[in-house]
């Protein structure tokens, strides 16, 4: 299954920011004596960093629960019989999603840097 992400930077490129947003950006940049571009860059970096921290915390929680470090390791434990799938499959799915989001946030942070 392919998930489509409509609000990716690629899909939003070329769209105009609402006037209120532009005015707010301009006002804050002026108050901080930085360019609007730098303010946007720092704001995006801070937001993405915050999101990444939350994702990593949830990954840490699930990983600690099963004594694993990744989805691959959890799947290996299923295969060797040291982890019951019936009790943990939802966490496996959640961890898989979180790892994808973590990797995507890292890519976005690199693009913003």
Annotate each predicted stretch with a short phrase.
Residues 79-94:
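Short, glycine/alanine-rich amphipathic alpha-helical segment
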Residues 1-77, 100-113:
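Small, basic N-terminal interaction modules of short regulatory proteins
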């Amino acid at each position: 299954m392919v998930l489509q992400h409509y609000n990716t930077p690629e899909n939003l490129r070329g769209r105009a920011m609402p006037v209120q947003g532009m005015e707010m950006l301009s006002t804050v940049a002026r108050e901080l004596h930085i360019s609007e571009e730098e303010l946007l860059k720092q704001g995006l970096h801070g937001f993405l960093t915050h999101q990444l921290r939350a994702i990593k915390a949830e990954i840490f929680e699930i990983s600690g629960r099963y004594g694993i470090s990744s989805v691959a390791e959890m799947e290996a434990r299923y295969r060797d019989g040291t982890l019951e799938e019936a009790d943990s499959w939802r966490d496996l799915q959640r961890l898989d999603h979180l790892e994808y989001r973590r990797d995507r946030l890292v890519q976005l942070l690199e693009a913003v840097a």
